[in-house]
């Protein structure tokens, strides 16, 4: 028994005294270091694989994590002086501050002080810098936008990750970047890829002595859009000196071939942080370049809403498309005169003529008859008052006005006059260009698509099946609606006839002029749009589908303060259709 106790005592002595020194030495000599690997961000490509958002390849510079100790500060400063000498555009104090900001006695990973140096700049300094054990040169990438402002509101940009971003997205802690707007934001999780790591055992000099584990950073491939750069450039050309929005969308699938919000801004200005001067220039621009008007521009829809309202009349007003209604120059109710857009009026009209010539009084009368609830029910089915589901962040749902909406949001009762002016897309009614484009596709196909920009995520093709939202009666009456739109473009007395004469294919369309300032209905002789101050002029709409007999695309355009709708938007529509034809999308 005594011998056994002696053996146990001897073993404890060995472990606690002799082995302690050996293990202690190893502990001070070997530390596990985990280096996080960040992937290159996925590219955003157009439908023909032309880059919309790409990556410049280069290098980053990192320093030994132990140079922040007081005794090592002279070494840190010497290394920084060498770096600045080779790259004179870098600032020594800024580099030192960046290092010390990230320095911690608990950190054993190299500290990045320069996130990106181009290949060209690094080539002449690479050999000299890599002679130092304190400096690490690693592969790096930097986002850039090869087309500058093209489709800026769609593509979006990346920027420095905030504390809140990092709390919600651990990858952004290591990349330092996150998608801020547009598709860069909406698909950020896909585009940023997945972090990797290298776990190594290092000695006190921070030199690796053993590889413990490794996982490569994973770039999740690139994202391909439905956008065609060449078609997008056509939109840009037409809106060079205009404000507003334009959308070209496949009516069957909802795939967007081109979409612009104007004015645009140069996405590359945001790489590394936008200058104060440039920021102020954009913020103070009265045409609001920071608003993505495709999804957040909310405008009175004006007469482009009349197709949906007309469908509601056919369902609830006990009429058909050929029922003729007297349409004098105005409709009088409650002591107010609700005037037609033309002082002479239109004598009489059925639904098809009311669409062809945009007969306001036809809509005034029948909206009074069926009431706002019936109209709103039809229009809600067609997607108004709700988001379309387009793959962009923070979409507005607009306003589909009803008595309950007005009471709840404005604390005011509903009046018959509200119903009457809502029937021509005025008053409280507000919609977005993407809602109008989607609604136009519904009129063309009888189904409601989900607008979308993405075509492929990596090797996975995206699918957004359209929704079957109309009842059988509504579907049966769409042909009459389409005929009214066809005649608006192709009959000599149609509101858009002269404006779209140059189109290479037959269109179905509807124009709309949406007032931005109130004009009393009692005023018979109104100021001409061209004589108004710019900001008082009406917004100009046109929406179309084409070709008429076999619809493939919807084109929706709004020109802010454009005045006469057909004159402001018709030529733009024709130019877009010609480009679609030239690119082979239509015969």
Language model regions located:
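Short solvent-exposed loop/turn micro-motifs enriched in small/polar/acidic residues
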Residues: 35-37, 239-241, 536-538
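Beta-lactam-recognizing serine transpeptidase/beta-lactamase-like catalytic domain environment
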Residues: 53, 103, 203-204, 210-212, ...
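Gram-negative outer-membrane assembly/targeting C-terminal domains
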Residues: 581-587
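Generic short beta-strand
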Residues: 41-44, 244-247, 257, 322, ...
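Solvent-exposed, polar/charged alpha-helical surfaces in well-ordered, non-transmembrane soluble domains
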Residues: 77-81, 85, 123, 127, ...
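Conserved, well-ordered alpha-helix/loop/beta-strand core segments that scaffold catalytic motifs
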Residues: 110, 205-245, 252
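Membrane-proximal periplasmic segments of bacterial cell-envelope enzymes
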Residues: 1-191, 195-204, 215-216, 243-245, ...
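Second-shell loop/turn segments in exported
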Residues: 31-33, 62-72, 83-84, 107-116, ...
């Amino acid at each position: 028994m005594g011998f056994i106790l002696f053996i146990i005592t001897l073993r404890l002595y060995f472990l606690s005294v002799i082995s302690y020194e050996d293990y202690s030495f190893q502990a001070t000599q070997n530390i596990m270091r985990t280096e996080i690997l960040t992937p290159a961000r996925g590219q955003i490509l157009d439908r023909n694989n032309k880059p919309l958002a790409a990556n410049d390849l280069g290098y980053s510079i990192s320093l030994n994590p132990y140079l922040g100790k007081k005794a090592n500060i002279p070494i840190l400063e010497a290394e920084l002086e060498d770096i600045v000498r080779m790259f004179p555009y870098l600032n020594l104090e800024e580099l030192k501050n960046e290092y010390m900001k990230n320095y911690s006695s608990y950190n054993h990973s190299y500290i990045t002080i320069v996130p990106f140096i181009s290949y060209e700049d690094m080539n002449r300094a690479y050999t000299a810098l890599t002679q130092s054990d304190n400096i690490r040169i690693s592969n790096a990438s930097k986002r850039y936008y090869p087309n500058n402002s093209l489709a800026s509101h769609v593509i979006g940009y990346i920027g420095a990750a905030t504390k809140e971003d990092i709390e919600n997205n651990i990858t952004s802690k290591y990349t330092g970047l996150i998608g801020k707007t547009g598709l860069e934001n909406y698909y950020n999780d896909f585009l940023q890829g997945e972090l990797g790591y290298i776990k190594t055992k290092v000695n006190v000099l921070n030199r690796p002595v053993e590889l413990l584990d490794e996982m490569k950073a994973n770039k999740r491939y690139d994202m391909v859009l439905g956008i065609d750069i060449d078609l997008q450039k056509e939109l840009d050309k037409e809106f060079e000196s205009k404000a507003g929005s334009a959308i070209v969308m496949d009516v069957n699938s909802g795939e967007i071939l081109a979409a612009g919000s104007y004015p645009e801004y140069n996405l590359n200005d945001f790489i590394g942080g936008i200058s104060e001067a440039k920021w102020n220039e954009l913020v103070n621009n009265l045409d609001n370049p920071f608003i993505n008007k495709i999804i957040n521009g909310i405008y009175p829809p004006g007469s482009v809403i009349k197709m949906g309202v007309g469908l509601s009349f056919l369902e609830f007003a006990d009429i058909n498309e050929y029922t003729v209604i007297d349409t004098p120059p105005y409709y009088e109710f409650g002591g107010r005169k609700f005037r037609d857009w033309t002082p002479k009026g239109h004598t009489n009209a059925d639904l098809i003529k009311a669409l062809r010539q945009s007969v306001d009084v036809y809509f005034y009368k029948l909206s009074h008859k069926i009431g706002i609830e019936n109209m709103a029910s039809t229009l809600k089915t067609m997607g108004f008052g709700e988001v379309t589901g387009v793959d962009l962040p923070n979409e507005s749902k607009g306003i589909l006005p009803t008595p309950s909406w007005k009471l709840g949001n404005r604390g005011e009762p509903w009046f018959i006059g509200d119903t009457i002016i809502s029937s021509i897309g005025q008053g409280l009614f507000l919609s977005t260009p993407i809602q109008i484009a989607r609604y136009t596709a519904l009129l063309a196909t009888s189904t409601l698509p989900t607008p979308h920009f993405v075509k492929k995520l990596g090797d996975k093709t995206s699918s957004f099946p359209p929704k079957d939202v109309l009842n059988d009666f509504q579907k049966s009456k769409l042909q009459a609606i389409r005929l009214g739109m066809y005649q608006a473009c192709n009959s000599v007395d149609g509101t858009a006839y002269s404006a779209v004469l140059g189109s290479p294919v037959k269109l179905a369309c509807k124009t709309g002029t949406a007032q931005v300032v109130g004009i009393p209905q009692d005023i018979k002789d109104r100021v001409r749009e061209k004589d108004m101050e710019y900001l008082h002029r009406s917004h100009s709409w046109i929406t179309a589908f084409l070709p008429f007999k076999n619809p493939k695309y919807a084109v929706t355009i709004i020109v802010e303060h454009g005045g006469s709708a057909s004159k402001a938007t018709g030529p733009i529509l024709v130019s877009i259709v010609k480009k679609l034809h030239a690119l082979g999308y239509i015969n």
